[in-house]
Amino acid sequence: MSNHLPGVFIVSDSIGETAEMVVRAAASQFNSGNMEIRQVPNISDTETLEEIINQAAASNFIIAYTLVINELADFLKMEARKKGVICVDVLGPVIEAFKSVSDIEPRREPGLLRKVDEMYYRRVEAVEFAVRYDDGKDPRGVMQSDIVLVGVSRTSKTPLSMYLAHKRIKVANVPLVPEVEPPEEIFQVEKGKVIGLVINPEQLNQIRTERLKTLGLKGQASYANLERILEEMEYAQEIMKRLGCPVIDVTNRAVEETASKILEIYYRRLSHV
């Protein structure tokens, strides 16, 4: 017996983060100074495992592993037992527990947690992107985006940008206003990336009037004036015609329904790239 913790080989058919976190958490319960950890990720063959077992036996290390491929895990357990090396299966018992109380078979596919993490971070990145490049704040976002939404005010550009961001799609949106020249970038991006949004003028009039009321302003302001709305719509349609972009009518459509149409266009474009 020793007053020091043994070294540990972290062995995984993915990157080994899970096993390392568990090992460090366990080691923190012992006041024995530093512990040597040797990490061996992306294991895919028994030859590498055999080499690790031999090194562990020679150095008096233990092995902590996350191997979801049964053949590799079985080989490691059998050969380690022969050499007197202690092996700790970090993931297997939990997988078997889930399996025992359900009719679901585990996928036995390495790296799934990392894929989930990557999806999460891509979603966060897309949400941050939507906030940063909302309402034409910075035209640089147009070139970096997956989709660019254009349309007059209150055509659901921002809600759609956020909804699509939660599907890990980076969306910039640009308001079309007669007095403001749209950024040149929307004419420079690849065809099909820009999508126009239009709406029935009377419905837009109602939406804007309600918006003004929530802000404590009078509904008679030019922003909600039907004549002004028609002027804006005409200008927006001219820009969309110049762009040659697909156009979606959002009248009486829920955000989810419009987003579905946008995704159809988006995936169709990707399939032709």
Swiss-Prot record:
Gene Ontology MF terms in the entry: ADP binding; ATP binding; phosphotransferase activity, phosphate group as acceptor; protein serine/threonine kinase activity
Enzyme Commission number(s) of this protein: 2.7.11.32, 2.7.4.27
Function summary: Bifunctional serine/threonine kinase and phosphorylase involved in the regulation of the pyruvate, phosphate dikinase (PPDK) by catalyzing its phosphorylation/dephosphorylation.
Reaction(s) the record says it catalyses: N(tele)-phospho-L-histidyl/L-threonyl-[pyruvate, phosphate dikinase] + ADP = N(tele)-phospho-L-histidyl/O-phospho-L-threonyl-[pyruvate, phosphate dikinase] + AMP + H(+); N(tele)-phospho-L-histidyl/O-phospho-L-threonyl-[pyruvate, phosphate dikinase] + phosphate + H(+) = N(tele)-phospho-L-histidyl/L-threonyl-[pyruvate, phosphate dikinase] + diphosphate
PANTHER family named among the record's database cross-references: PYRUVATE, PHOSPHATE DIKINASE REGULATORY PROTEIN 1, CHLOROPLASTIC (PTHR31756:SF3)
Entry superkingdom: Bacteria
Protein name, entry field: Putative pyruvate, phosphate dikinase regulatory protein 2
